[in-house]
Amino acid sequence: MDHRLLEIVACPVCNGRLYFNKEKLELICKADGLAYPVRDGIPVLLENEARKLGADEITQ
């Protein structure tokens, strides 16, 4: 994931910062506890595509 892209994309729910999880290929919003998938290098920033994070995943 290009670091320049991470500087401009934001969570579609809260407009908060997103963090890239390289192992799971997801963009993480810690504020909302959501993980957005990255498919073929393209972030899928749709709320209905997001996965709810467990409490242990948010703190990582």
Swiss-Prot record:
Pfam families: Trm112p (PF03966). Gene3D superfamilies: 2.20.25.10. SUPFAM superfamilies: Trm112p-like. One of its GO terms (cellular component) is cytosol. Belongs to the UPF0434 family. This is UPF0434 protein ECA2555. It comes from Pectobacterium atrosepticum (strain SCRI 1043 / ATCC BAA-672).
